Amino acid sequence: MNKIIQFVLILAVGLVLYFLLNRMMQKLMVELSEILYKEVNPEKYLQVLNGWKGKMFFSKKTRSLMAIDALLMQNETAKIEEIFEQLDAVKMNPGNKLGLAQKEVSFYIDTKQFDKALKAYDTLKEIAAKFNNPQVESILKECTFLVEIYIHHNTEILDELLDLAGKMSNPFYQGIFLYRAAKLYYFKQDEENCRKLLEEAKEKLQGTAWEVMIRQMLEENPALVAER
């Protein structure tokens, strides 16, 4: 009887610890999201992510993957490429591999490494084909937009792109999509709407390296949008 009681007590304590730790992890993820996307504070985000709480709940590979968005805001291209090389060389579950390919498509397009972008896009399509859920389809669609905008300059998707940007709740990503729509207006030789969307994107991207870049375009030459 004593052994049964001990087993029940150990099981009960284990369950309490499991739910407590799970709640702490969820709370940390909410905290990190608010720091990065509401406060737009990538430096603080990385400090918390790589602090004791981040190390407690996330593996080194996961933390590297989670760091990419913050490093994008800081325009730390060398660090991002280093992370991509490290993560491409290790085994990851399909979900993380999908997230990595998504970030690679975006990054390599932004840095005009189009061969690498198309390679990552092919990888993304292969992984996405193994899933059957709306979230994965949304990720694939977003990356298809990037390929069509930056590599093929396809202005036919402009209305769809603007509709997607309007539905986004995250100001950082909304700003990025508005900026990309501005590019398409430039490719259509519509400078008025190009400038208008650059202004809107700048407001959404306050406090980031993107804001500085867009401000320079508006002050010097909106045609720079075609190159960046």
Question: Where does each model-flagged region fall?
Answer:
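Residue at a conserved register position within TPR or TPR-like alpha-solenoid repeats
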Residues: 35-36, 71, 108, 148, ...
